[in-house]
Amino acid sequence: RAWDYLCMNRGAMIYVNKDPKEIQTAIKETRPNMMCAVPRFWEKVYAGVHEKIEKMPGLVKKLMYHAIAVGKKRNLDYVRFNKSVPFSTEIQYKIFKKTLFAKVKKELGLENSMYFPCAGSQLSESVCEFLMSLDFNMVVGYGLTESTATVSCFQPAHKHHDLKSVGEGMQ
């Protein structure tokens, strides 16, 4: 509820999906900028993308996995720790972001993505790494539904965050 109030306060449109089986269709129709989702949703995205990659021809498959590795190296090894990104890594990343990552996001209906709050249970480290490699701005947190209070979260902008945690307590 608190998320809805925040969105309404900022003039955002709110879409409510009543049927979990129709989530892919709903996302492709609405093309959200922001979306709250539980880790299970992102696990299915992770599995679905990997399933499609595995069905690709050999060279394309290798290119996709290389692109993900470059995204991981840039976003998790350098940007997350506020380190300077090597020129070759940055160039490759920018090319992959405009081509392959953009294509994956468009296929998912998430090409307009700004950030995605995620809570409800633990988001696995491998899924979080994958999403951040593709330039999804994940905001992973913990809070009590009963009190609508987020007590901790991390954002990629918070340097040095541990992907196995839900961040630091909010003040």
Which stretches of residues belong to each language-model region?
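Conserved ATP-binding loop and adjacent catalytic segment of the adenylate-forming AMP-binding
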Residues: 15, 89-94, 112-171
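Solvent-exposed alpha-helices and their adjacent loops that cap or buttress functional pockets
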Residues: 27, 107-111, 167
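Membrane-proximal helix-turn-helix segments that form the acceptor-binding/catalytic region
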Residues: 99-113
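Short polybasic/polar patches that bind polyanions
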Residues: 8, 106, 132
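Conserved AMP-binding/adenylation subdomain of ANL enzymes
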Residues: 1-98, 112, 137
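Generic structural marker for isolated residues within well-ordered, non-membrane alpha-helices
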Residues: 3, 101, 128
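Structural motif corresponding to the C-terminal cap of alpha-helices
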Residues: 75, 108, 159-161
